[in-house]
Amino acid sequence: MNEIRSMTVLPAVRTDVSFVTADGLTLVGELALPEHGEPVGTLLFLHPLPTAGGFMDSHIIRKAANRLPALANIAVLRFNFRGVTSPRGTSDGAFGHGVDERLDFEAALRFIRERGLPNPWVVGWSFGTEVALNHATEHDVAGLILLSPPLHRTSVEALERWNLNDVPIVAVVPEFDDYLPPAQARERFAVVPRLEIIEVEDGKHLWVGETQTTRVLSEIVAKVNPAALPLPTEFV
């Protein structure tokens, strides 16, 4: 047996993908599928702030793609928002301040639908949570998972729109978050009574370290495929 570490890449069917937004931009990404059988669910990752170095390889997103198809039978779609570069390539366009990224999210969700991938959960991290909260309300998604939500670009009105549907929403909030620690998160999110807040003891905004990584991935799997828990820490 081998211990799962930061750079571990478990077996999956990985494909470089691209899709086009409604305003004509080509975005680049990767789709990772379970090696055998159909996935039980799909994660659509929305990455952290591009102007602060966020991209499709931000470590939690990369590790989810590297592990969860094998460990939890989950498909993972990750991509670069407009104007963002990673080793996969550069998406067309320029940073849209969380506004134009609506079209990026919609193009990614459309790609999931066209591929027939099941049960799409939107997973935003930091800036990605703002894109999800502001732009996913009118779309048919299985749920939202918000990692380290800062609520910098999300108004009370945008939050209240989530009361018009019954989509499950969970916010995974680190105890020592730099922008929205748990007490403030409970206050800000109170306008959406069904929203579940999970406070992660000793957690920080960037979820650095294997302990925090495993906790975050476990909270995601708990919503999408709880039968896969606990996540293995070793592989053959």
Describe the predicted segments one by one:
Residues 164-166, 171-173, 177:
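Short beta-strand/loop motif that positions the catalytic acidic residue
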Residues 1-21, 25-36, 127, 233-236:
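An N-terminal hydrophobic leader/cap segment in hydrolases
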Residues 20, 25-33, 38-115:
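Serine-hydrolase catalytic machinery in alpha/beta-hydrolase-like enzymes
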Residues 157-159, 180-190, 212:
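Short alpha-helix in the alpha/beta-hydrolase fold that links the catalytic acid
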Residues 124-132:
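Gly/Ala-rich beta-loop-alpha elbow adjacent to hydrolase catalytic centers
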